[in-house]
Amino acid sequence: MPVYENKHRPITDDERRMILETIPKHYAGTMVLTMLCCGLRPIEIRRMKWDWIDFESAILTVGKSKTEAGTGRKIPIPPVLLDALKEHKAKELNNEYVFVKYEKHTRMDDNAFYQSWKNFVKEMDLANGAHLYRNQVKNSIIAPDFEPYLLRHTFCTDCQAAGVPINVAKEWMGHSDISVTAKIYTHMVDEVFEQNRMRMAQYAVTKSQQVESSTATN
């Protein structure tokens, strides 16, 4: 059984493309989309219940139902995932858990999670140039380190790219210490660099205009 931890890179744009193309075609697609859009840990995916989801407010509360007292870890659900979860729920009306064992429809354990992930990656691989020989994938184009925690790391870097403050991302990720979040945020992606470069350029222009205006009125 592989160990899903210490994966310190986001997925590439090409990996994201392959994931998004495979999601609609695979039984584990909604599970993978949830990891990508909400940054859940594998154990949280396995424990995820329908009453964690508030479909009206589009909020996922990890570890607590929306009717329980107290606060859980709240994560916003983007529209694309909300629609996928609604469709998925129609297939799993009699289950307490969102993601269950394939065909058996019972609670997913770690082995079932791994098998679902492995099967998803295999489908993704075959759809992008690999082929089967004696039931073994040949000429794989998937990176050897492509494992579930990469999606969690990607969610965090997506937060950074979208301009989410680090203290908010820390809460969404469920990190006990903001230094853990900071280790991810310090790996600045190109688009974040460009966004902030433009902000600083605009600030410099605005500040110069303010100084010129102040000088002109004196």
Predicted regions and their residues:
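Basic, Lys/Arg- and aromatic-enriched nucleic-acid-binding interface segment
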Residues: 1-46, 56, 67-70, 92
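Short, charged hinge/linker segments at domain and secondary-structure junctions
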Residues: 1-3, 131-139, 198-201
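Catalytic-site neighborhood detector that most strongly recognizes the C-terminal catalytic loop/helix
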Residues: 2-4, 10, 62-68, 105, ...
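Short, contiguous acidic/charged loop-to-helix segments that flank catalytic cores in large enzymes
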Residues: 7-8, 63-72, 101-109, 138-150, ...
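Short, basic (Lys/Arg/His-rich) helix/loop patches that form interaction surfaces
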Residues: 18-26, 38, 75, 91-97, ...
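Short, polar N-cap/turn motifs at the start of nucleic acid-interacting alpha helices
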Residues: 52-59, 145, 164-184, 207
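C-terminal secondary-structure termini that scaffold catalytic or DNA-interacting sites
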Residues: 57, 87, 91, 103-105, ...
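Well-ordered beta-strand positions in beta-sheet-rich domains
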Residues: 59, 72-76
